[in-house]
């Protein structure tokens, strides 16, 4: 992932907050906290995986530099993006009564305006217009999810 200069500065500042020794390194055990400070929400399993599955004792002894940390952040961000699409589609699949990849526009309207991060009526209508309902008032939810998450 290519980070903007602003994002790199933001990451550097967060990294330095955890760098107790001022040597430009942090302990493996701090990486998860830095990722979370930067707005990510990885599971402990995700963090362990991105660290290369180190033995537990290395978490408090082995260190990483900022240049080693950035690719870890990029990997977690990629996972998050991928996960959210899968999660979204999975959540909408519940409403796919006929198992044909489509849900009723009315149901989708209800879901978007009442669950999770609620959207305003205008946002819902605009999103549904982009989702192109078929003549039966159904929307292909996988395509719609891609549209919605890619903005």
Swiss-Prot record:
Q: Which domain of life is it from?
A: Eukaryota
Q: One GO molecular function term?
A: calcium ion binding
InterPro entries listed in its UniProt record? CALM/Myosin/TropC-like (IPR050230), EF-hand-dom_pair (IPR011992), EF_hand_dom (IPR002048)
Role:
In molluscan muscle, calcium regulation is associated with myosin rather than with actin. Muscle myosin contains two types of light chains: the catalytic light chain, essential for ATPase activity, and the regulatory light chain, a calcium-binding protein responsible for Ca(2+) dependent binding and Ca(2+) dependent Mg-ATPase activity.
Q: What name does UniProt use for this protein?
A: Myosin catalytic light chain, smooth muscle
| Gene3D superfamilies cross-referenced by the UniProt entry | EF-hand
Q: Which sequence positions carry the modification called N-acetylalanine?
A: 1
Q: Which Pfam families match?
A: EF-hand_7
Which key words are in the record? Acetylation, Motor protein, Muscle protein, Myosin, Repeat
Instruction: Specify the EF-hand domain's residue ranges.
Output: 6-41, 83-118, 119-151
> Among the entry's GO cellular component annotations, what is one?
myosin II complex
Show the PANTHER family listed in the entry: MYOSIN LIGHT CHAIN 1, 3 (PTHR23048), MYOSIN LIGHT CHAIN 4 (PTHR23048:SF1)
């Amino acid at each position: 992932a290519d980070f903007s200069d602003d994002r790199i500065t933001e990451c550097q500042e967060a990294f330095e907050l955890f760098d107790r020794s001022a040597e430009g390194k942090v302990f493996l055990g701090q990486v998860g906290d830095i990722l979370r400070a930067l707005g990510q929400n990885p599971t402990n399993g995700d963090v362990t995986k991105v660290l290369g599955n180190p033995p537990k004792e290395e978490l408090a002894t082995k260190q990483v530099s900022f240049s080693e940390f950035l690719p870890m952040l990029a990997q977690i961000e990629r996972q998050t993006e991928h996960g959210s699409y899968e999660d979204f589609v999975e959540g909408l699949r519940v409403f796919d009564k006929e198992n044909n990849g489509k849900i009723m526009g009315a149901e989708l309207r209800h879901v978007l305006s009442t669950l999770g991060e609620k959207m305003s009526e205008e946002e819902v209508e605009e999103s549904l217009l982009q989702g192109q309902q078929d003549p039966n008032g159904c929307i292909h939810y996988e395509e719609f999810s891609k549209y919605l998450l890619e903005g």
